[in-house]
UniProtKB/Swiss-Prot annotation:
Annotated HD domain residues: 237-338
Main location: plastid
Reaction(s) catalysed by this chain's protein: GTP + ATP = guanosine 3'-diphosphate 5'-triphosphate + AMP
Similarity comment: Belongs to the RelA/SpoT family.
Segments for region (Disordered): 65-84
A Gene Ontology molecular function term of the record: GTP diphosphokinase activity
Alphabetized UniProt keyword annotations: ATP-binding, Chloroplast, GTP-binding, Kinase, Nucleotide-binding, Plastid, Stress response, Transferase, Transit peptide
Name of the gene encoding the protein in the UniProt record: RSH3
Transit peptide as recorded in UniProt: 1-64
Protein name: Probable GTP diphosphokinase RSH3, chloroplastic
Main function: Probable ppGpp (guanosine 3'-diphosphate 5'-diphosphate) synthetase that may be involved in a rapid plant ppGpp-mediated response to pathogens and other stresses.
Amino acid sequence: MVVATTIALYASPASTVCSTAHQINAHISCDLDLNSRSSSASSSTSSPTIGGLSLLFSGASVKSSSSSSSSHPSVGEELASIRHDRSEDRTLSGSFCYSPSKFIGSSYLKRDHQSPVSVLHGPISSGNSPPMRISRDRNLDGGSALRVGSSRLFNGFVRKAIGSCVDYDTDSVLVDEQLPFTMDDGFEGERRQPYARDLLRRAQLKHKIFEDESVIKAFYEAEKAHRGQMRATGDPYLQHCVETAMLLADIGANSTVVVAGILHDTLDDSFMSYDYILRTFGSGVADLVEGVSQLSKLARENNTACKTVEADRLHTMFLAMADARAVLIKLADRLHNMMTLYALPPVKRQRFAKETLEIFAPLANRLGISSWKVKLENLCFKHLHPDQHHEMSDMLEDSFDEAMITSAIEKLEQALKKEGISYHVVSGRHKSLYSIYCKMLKKKLTMDEIHDIHGLRLIVDNEKDCYKALGVVHKLWSEVPGKLKDYISHPKFNGYQSLHTVVMGDGTIPLEVQIRTKEMHLQAEFGFAAHWRYKEGDCKHSSFVLQMVEWARWVVTWHFETMSKDGSSICSSEPLCSFPSHAEDCPFSYKPSGNQEGPVYVIVIENEKMSVQEFPENSTVSDLLRRAGPGSSRWSMYSIPAKEELRPRLNQTPVSDLKCKLKMGDVVELTPAIPDKSLTEYREEIQRMYDRGLAFSRPHRAATGTMVGWGS
């Protein structure tokens, strides 16, 4: 007992500077009224609806020049992601693609929501959408392997980015009757609701990460938490949780992020508390869910009509974004809400879309997640300008020449083979409606005057082949002067790299051709995930902390940039510099300066946890330590003063003068250390406890006649 008590003295909970006054408690309803509550049964009685994510995220039906296994595409796949490739890297060609492998008649394309741009016509609930294609060698009774989507999309590159657990080569689908854990509160017998079981199985068919024990447990915890809750669409609330998590899995998020995605609304909309999630899933998941809750509260209360209030809430939002993974979850949550926005009244749709276009779409853009950025912008465009969206959708559909795209793909493939240039994918694509709309406004053009609406995308092995392929393209078709853009040598602000050229295709129709490597494509589609690879080499901190510091510095910059804008155009979302670096002439750089006015934002690291904290102008390191709490005021669980000192390091340099002023973007590390005087006091206190223990045990042994010793 004495030994255990002595050891416990050095295991008292660490101080937590990270949980500052800027944390926000949020326990009210979710974003706007999208998630209406109902006391009706959890299971939905609505008829199956084909669409939604099956259109947006399904892989394509492809004709491979290699001998790859054939598959059975779903209806959504045939409509939304039709393309042509020659490898198993089938998801490389993007969201909007055409293919010569399957011809669809024009009458079929002109049916409701069945055009090549049907993904832009508005979201449809995907609760009963068919799963992704299953290869023919799949024995549905449990025999052979299941292959869903691309088997190699996240191998290596994105997997290293944020610890991806995505694996498309799953041997089996774990059914809920075989759970490797036991649910609490007698939930084991209640969990077999058909809609929940089917929802989990569909998720498992698409992503193996949904077979992870923690993910399955989170699924059933979310089902229990949201049971009886219905969304405005009429779907069970659990469906939104799973769709959000599936969006995260699509970009390679690991199990911690996916679990937090499933649970992201439990703090605001259920009986669950932070402590409950902490006990059940650990601090990593609990902190992420709390971070998403903070962002959700700010989004709910944001009033874009009042610039002063908006500025205050935006800068608080930035402070809440210390963990970038929470932002990923919030972006996925917002994307799925936008996909089901049709269920809200028109006024609320407009307000929700305006906020998304002003805050969340630019955020996805700056992080380089182009697939999410495009979807958010197009959905906002649909609800903010429905007439223009409808008119441009019809024009884009009418201008689509499937035969021309098919011919161009085949022609380019033959030329590449003749030159001995290997490639992964050749696919058709078109410019997003919102991008076309912005270009028309900016350059005062008609839709017919824009040359890069339709085009091809070519994915090759390496950078050298990019330039070789460019030469092949210019031999096949005549180049439009002044339209060549080399983003490989001069990347865009968010790290985007590619070669762009415009040529006159067959029939004198302008055709934009994009050429990039597989790595460049993954960077373009999942920029944030692709960028955050774990760093190698000798580091004083864990790679995760270093990444968080980069994120915090970038947040500080974006704060100043956003606050400096005086009502910019809705189409101008391009920042001056890319995450996490800064351009040399960037006026919002975090480089320390002596003439800083207004509040100062400082990155604080303690016990490998990081927070972004706001301090008044002219604050010092001493002020920061005072906020952290003096050592003499900290008490351990044994009522012994925890007199450790916080030894600060400012930008990796020990601080000798506590009156040193803090500057924008400073990194302050707080390292606890026990001074010599306190060590002496600890030893004396331990000795006194030991003596009291001996004094108590001697009369007790004498009374009972029991021999107690340290050894045998």
